[in-house]
């Protein structure tokens, strides 16, 4: 059976909130890696510069991700206001709550 619009919207929002956790972990790992490279005096400056660029890229990506989470959350909320289907919407409400908690913490 094909996924419904509700399933698609819920899974998309959950995927984005999960990705945020991965990006936060990547950010921590990259910060630790850059700090370690800065302590090591034998590191090639080019390698350090490239790792700092990777760190900056991750930092720049997060605000865009938060905006996407906000958009998907609002889209799901609007969808639920007019939803007339018979599916259980508790999973959708849970995803909205999780997304809102994530956004509030940032």
From Swiss-Prot:
Q: Which GO terms describe its biological process?
A: post-chaperonin tubulin folding pathway; protein folding; tubulin complex assembly
Recorded superkingdom: Eukaryota
Phosphoserine found at: 94
The record ties this protein, via InterPro entries, to: TBCA, TBCA_sf
* Predominant place of localization: cytoplasm
GO cellular-component terms in the record? cytoplasm; microtubule; microtubule cytoskeleton
Q: Which GO terms describe its molecular function?
A: beta-tubulin binding; tubulin binding
Q: What are the record keywords, sorted?
A: Chaperone, Cytoplasm, Cytoskeleton, Microtubule, Phosphoprotein
The UniProt entry, under Gene3D superfamilies, shows: 1.20.58.90
Q: Where in the cell is it found?
A: Cytoplasm, Cytoskeleton
Additional information: Present with 1760 molecules/cell in log phase SD medium.
Protein family = Belongs to the TBCA family.
Function of the protein: Tubulin-folding protein; involved in the early step of the tubulin folding pathway.
Q: What is this protein called?
A: Tubulin-specific chaperone A
Species for this entry: Saccharomyces cerevisiae (strain ATCC 204508 / S288c) (Baker's yeast)
């Amino acid at each position: 059976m094909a996924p419904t619009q509700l399933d698609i919207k819920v899974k998309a929002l959950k995927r984005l909130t999960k990705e945020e956790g991965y990006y936060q972990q990547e950010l921590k790992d990259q910060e630790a890696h850059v700090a370690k490279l800065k302590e090591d005096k034998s590191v090639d400056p080019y390698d350090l510069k490239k790792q700092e660029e990777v760190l900056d890229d991750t930092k720049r990506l997060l605000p865009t991700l938060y905006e996407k989470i906000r958009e998907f959350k609002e889209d799901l909320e609007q969808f639920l206001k007019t939803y007339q289907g018979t599916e259980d919407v508790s999973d959708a409400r849970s995803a909205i709550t999780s997304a809102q908690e994530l956004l509030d913490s940032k």
